[in-house]
From Swiss-Prot:
Principal subcellular localization: plastid
Biological process according to GO: aerobic respiration; electron transport coupled proton transport; photosynthesis, light reaction
Function: NDH shuttles electrons from NAD(P)H:plastoquinone, via FMN and iron-sulfur (Fe-S) centers, to quinones in the photosynthetic chain and possibly in a chloroplast respiratory chain. The immediate electron acceptor for the enzyme in this species is believed to be plastoquinone. Couples the redox reaction to proton translocation, and thus conserves the redox energy in a proton gradient.
Cofactor: [4Fe-4S] cluster
Name used for this protein in its record: NAD(P)H-quinone oxidoreductase subunit K, chloroplastic
Designated gene of the protein: ndhK
Length: 225
């Protein structure tokens, strides 16, 4: 907490009294009581689950896992985010009260990971859907790295001005079709545009004749490139 010195008050008040601004007091209280909403969809979440044990004891940072987004101010995305899960993730973020923060944990969350090059259903970066405060790369990151990310987020909160945080709030969200992103309005109502969330048919829904016909139409030159 940033302290402010008042010479006239220091002469009459005991040393146990701390003088500061309301903004710094608010930041200090929030960074010491972050309540994360755990959003784990893949193996990265297993590393985060290790923090709950006695070896790392993340309770010392004031972290209290919550199962409801309305009681959380931090969402930690760990694992692959598919286009089918994209509206659910955005809705969870919209339901969290301000101010709220996001930690993107793992390569799959940040860039799509190994699914980003040849996958029709993976979002290439969770920051296309929600604003991210701290990026935590790794496959998967170690629990010590998660603690370091939480420490960096706490430092960011301690220097934060509340008015600037509200002013820079993201108003638009991005949805993807075949990795082409389209900006849409905020979806507080929960009414999603189903056209933007169209999923390509799986191979089980395609007949064998159509499958081999599409394969035969691709030249060997395209396959090499």
């Amino acid at each position: 907490m940033n302290l402010i010195e008042f010479p006239s008050l220091d002469q009459t008040m005991p040393n146990s009294v701390i003088s500061t601004t309301l903004n710094d007091l608010s930041n200090w209280s929030r960074l010491s009581s972050l309540w994360p909403l755990l959003y784990g969809t893949s193996c990265c979440f297993i590393e985060f689950a290790a923090l709950i044990g006695s070896r790392f004891d993340f309770d010392r940072y004031g972290l209290v896992p919550r199962s409801s987004p309305r009681q959380a101010d931090l969402i930690l995305t760990a694992g692959t985010v598919t286009m089918k899960m994209a509206p659910s993730l955005v809705r969870l973020y919209e339901q969290m009260p301000e101010p709220k923060y996001v930690i993107a944990m793992g390569a799959c969350t940040i860039t799509g990971g190994m699914f980003s090059t040849d996958s029709y259903s993976t979002v290439r970066g969770v920051d296309k859907l929600i604003p991210v405060d701290v990026y935590l790369p790794g496959c998967p990151p170690k629990p010590e790295a998660v603690i370091d990310a939480i420490t960096k987020l706490r430092k960011k909160i301690s220097r934060e001005i509340y008015e600037d945080r509200i002013g820079s709030k993201q108003e638009n969200r991005c949805f993807t079709i075949n990795h082409k992103f389209h900006v849409q309005r905020s979806i507080h109502t929960g009414n999603y545009n189903k056209e933007l969330l169209y999923q390509s048919p799986s191979t089980s829904e395609i007949t064998s004749e159509e499958f081999f016909r599409s394969k035969s139409s691709i030249s060997s030159h395209k396959l090499v490139n």
